[in-house]
């Protein structure tokens, strides 16, 4: 049998309710199993992102609560720190509280990963998705 650690987490009520719906829909035996599965998916994604190498082009999509303290200023400052990597940004208002930014990037994969990590860790950021491609002539035929 695998050793298990018991942990406690705090979640917003609506997030837990939505997660519980998915647990029921997918037929998980328990909430713990669903959380373990989610953590496994997160670890796989993390390993994939951190195994990227070489020159890449892509997008970093960010959803954030613009009412959160200084989040827009922090995101802008971080983007200015990576100005050589960022080709363009698109800003969209999703609703009264939330905005989405799509950051077009081109450069070394490790720099793209660093930028993504810094954006992800900001308070008020709800979701970040990195999509990368091999630019130009490096695409396998």
Curated annotation (Swiss-Prot):
Similarity annotation: Belongs to the transcriptional regulatory CopG/NikR family.
Gene Ontology terms describing biological process: response to nickel cation
GO MF terms, alphabetically ordered: DNA binding; DNA-binding transcription factor activity; nickel cation binding
Lineage, uppermost ranks: Archaea, Methanobacteriati, Methanobacteriota, Methanomada group, Methanococci
Function: Transcriptional regulator.
Protein name from the UniProt record: Putative nickel-responsive regulator
HAMAP family for this protein: NikR (MF_00476)
InterPro entries, A to Z: Acetolactate_synth/TF_NikR_C, ACT-like_dom_sf, Arc_rbn_hlx_hlx, CopG, CopG/NikR_regulator, Ni_resp_reg_NikR, Ribbon_hlx_hlx, TF_NikR_Ni-bd_C
Species assigned in the record: Methanococcus maripaludis (strain C7 / ATCC BAA-1331)
Binding site for Ni(2+): 80, 91, 93, 99
Alphabetically ordered keywords of this record: DNA-binding, Metal-binding, Nickel, Transcription, Transcription regulation
């Amino acid at each position: 049998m695998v050793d298990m650690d018991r942990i406690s987490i705090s979640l917003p009520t609506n997030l837990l309710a939505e997660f519980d719906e998915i647990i029921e829909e997918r037929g998980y035996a328990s909430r713990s199993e669903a959380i373990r599965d989610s953590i496994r998916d997160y670890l796989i994604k993390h390993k994939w992102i951190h195994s990227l190498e070489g020159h890449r082009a892509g997008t970093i999509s960010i959803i954030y609560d613009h009412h959160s303290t200084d989040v827009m200023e922090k995101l802008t400052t971080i983007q200015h720190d990576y100005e050589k990597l960022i080709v363009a940004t698109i800003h969209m208002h999703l609703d009264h509280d939330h905005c989405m930014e799509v950051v077009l990037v081109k450069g070394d994969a490790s720099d793209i990963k660093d930028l993504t990590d810094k954006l992800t860790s900001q308070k008020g950021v709800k979701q970040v998705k990195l999509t990368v491609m091999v630019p130009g002539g490096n695409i396998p035929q």
